[in-house]
Amino acid sequence: ENKQEATQPAVIEKNGHKVTIFNYMDSDNFKEYSSDVMPVAGDSSPGYSAWDDVESPKQISAAKENGSDFIIVYMHYGNEYSRSPNQMQEKISHKAIDAGADTVVGSHTHVTEGIEMYNGKPIFYNLGNFIFDQSNTATHRAYFLNFQITGDNVTSVVYPVDINGYLPHFMSSSDGRSLLEQLNPQCPQMKITDDGTGELSFSLNSTENYTSPSF
């Protein structure tokens, strides 16, 4: 009904872990749309939860302080059909990690974008399509994620898929490896398995130093 409700995260408690999921949209990318078509939630009006450079990091930090074990920030951002993240995507994602997020997962571009490790935490800039169908063959290649939490360690399993008839289908091992190898130069920490899936492990308490990738 309003901005306060729109920015509330989903909280899931399972197997002794408290998982918090925030969902934001980069409103700067959609300025061409009128507020009637795509309204931002206001103090007393409904709409989507827009990323705010000041307030959103505060919300993430508060979740960490309130005992969240694993924080996911799901972003709707980026330029459609671009295979590389733009500067705003990188800025938002880094701010989210700095505020306490354990991973950032992106959507919107309809194609896959690179994976980055920032200060020991993964950023999946864009998963591509899922239950969606387009004629452009570049939009048929995508992936989804499975986060496996064991103590303070997390393994992100990356499953490449083909979109056919509005439905995702697991890729063959060779096609899966091909897709992951395209993403891998930006994230050499990711292991590509023989069956064509990816595995990226990290610690919830990581203090790794950051090295900027070249997308």
Please place each PLM-identified region on the residue numbering.
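Acidic, metal/ion-coordinating pockets
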Residues: E1-F215
